[in-house]
Amino acid sequence: MDQDHLKNAKNATRRVGRLRSLGIVTVGGAALVAGITAYKNQDQLFRTFVMPAVRLLPAEASHQLAVLACKYRLCPVSQYHDDQNLHTSFFGRMLSNPIGIAAGFDKNAEAVDGLQDLGFGFIEVGTVTPAAQEGNPKPRVFRLTEDKAIINRYGFNSDGHQAVLQRLRLLRKKENFNGVVGVNLGRNKTTMSPIADYVQGVRVFGPVADYLVINVSSPNTKGLRDMQSKEKLRELLEQVNDTKSSLDKNKNVPILLKLSPDLSLDDMKDIVWVIKRKKSRVDGLIVSNTTVSRENIEKNKLAEETGGLSGPPLKARSTEMIAQMYQLTDGKIPIIGVGGVASGYDAYEKIEAGASYVQIYTALVYEGPALVEDIKAELSALITRLGHTNVADVVGTNSKFYLPK
C-alpha cells in the first residue's frame, strides 16, 4: 500500500472512531438528559440510576458525558450551605470550603460553571499544553471497579493554550461568576523545549488564572517526571518565576508544583531544597499525582494496563507524602492534598496530615455529584466534634502520625 493510501486509511479509521465515540456519548447523553429533566435536584436518582447507567459506557465516553453534563449545567445545583468552619483563605482569596476538583476532569475549561454548581470551593482545569494534541492512543482509561479506582494514560490530551484561554476570558466576563479557577500547565509530547512550554503557559494564563500549577509529575508523558530532579527543577522554576515577575497583569499569581507519589525521601529533600530558594520558590504544593505502583489493589487484568493509578489504593501513600512534605517544609508551604479522597473523614485525614485544601476526582466518577455535599457535611461535623473552630486549625495537627513507620 502506498503512503497516500495508507494515510487515507488511517484518517478514515480515525473518523469512524470519532463517530462511534460521538454516538456513544450522544445516546448516553440523551438518557442522562431525560433522567435529569424528570428528576432534577434529586441526588438519590444519580446514585441509584444515573451513575450506574453512565458506568455502563466505556470509561472515556462516560468522562466525556460527565463533562458535557457540567458544561450544559444539567447536574443538580447544590443547595448545601457551607458552614462557617469550612471557610478558609486561599492564596489571598476566601473560599467557602476547602474542597476542589482536581485537574484531569475538566481538561479544557468547558465545564467550570457546572462544577461550581456542585459546590466545589475551587476548580482546577487542565492539564493544558501550548499546542493542541490528541494524547495517547485509545483505549487509555480503565475502571478498576472492585477498588473504585481508575488507571489512565491520557497523555495530556488538550485543546491547547489559545482555545482554553478564550474560554477562561469569557468566563471572567460573566457578572455572576466569582469562582476560584486554577490552570494546570503541561508540555507538549514532541516539544524540543520543555521549559519553554511551561514559561509560555505562565505568560498566557497568568493574567486570567487564580493560581497556576506546574505539572511535572504525570507518568503518561515520556521524560516528564525527570523534570522533578534537582537541577532540572531548579532551572524550570527559576524561569517560571522570572516570567511571572514580568507579567503586566496579576504578577503575583500563585505558582504551585504538583508532585509524584512515587518519589523517594531523598527526591523530596532535593525538591524542598529547590523550592526554598528565593529564585526557584513556589507558593504551594499539590500532593500527589497518580502512581505507577500497583500496590493495594485487587487482582485484576486491567491492573496490568500502563498508566497512572488513582482512587483509594493511592490514599495512604498520598497522605503519607503530605505529612512528609509538611514536615520537610516546616509547614510553611501550603499543600493541596489529593489522592483517594471519598469522604469527609478522608479529607480530614489529609488535612491533619498537613494539607490546607483537598481535591477529589476519582470518587466523583463512582459516587456522583452528591459526593461533594457529603464530604463537606462530614468534614464540617468532624471539625466541630473534635473541638476545632475552623478547618485551618486542623492543618498539620497530627502530621507525625502519618509519617512512614
Swiss-Prot record:
Q: Name one GO biological process term.
A: 'de novo' pyrimidine nucleobase biosynthetic process
How is the co-factor bound, per the entry? Answer: Binds 1 FMN per subunit.
| The UniProt record lists the keyword Transport | no
**What Pfam families would the database entry show?**
DHO_dh
Residue numbers on the Mitochondrial intermembrane membrane side: 40-401
Record-listed FMN binding positions: A103, G104, F105, D106, K107, T127, N184, N215, K258, S288, G311, G340, Y361, T362
Gene Ontology terms: cellular component: mitochondrial inner membrane; mitochondrial intermembrane space
Query: Where found, per UniProt?
Result: Mitochondrion inner membrane
Q: Which cofactor does it need?
A: FMN
Q: Which residues bind substrate?
A: K107, N152, R153, Y154, G155, F156, N215, V216, S217, S218, P219, N220, N289, T290
Cited InterPro entries = Aldolase_TIM, DHO_dehydrogenase, Dihydroorotate_DH_2, Dihydroorotate_DH_cat, Dihydroorotate_DH_CS
UniProt record similarity statement: Belongs to the dihydroorotate dehydrogenase family. Type 2 subfamily.
The UniProt function text for this chain reads:
Catalyzes the conversion of dihydroorotate to orotate with quinone as electron acceptor.
Under which name does UniProt file this protein? Dihydroorotate dehydrogenase (quinone), mitochondrial
- In its UniProt entry, the species of origin is given as Drosophila melanogaster (Fruit fly)
Question: The organism's lineage?
Answer: Eukaryota, Metazoa, Ecdysozoa, Arthropoda, Hexapoda
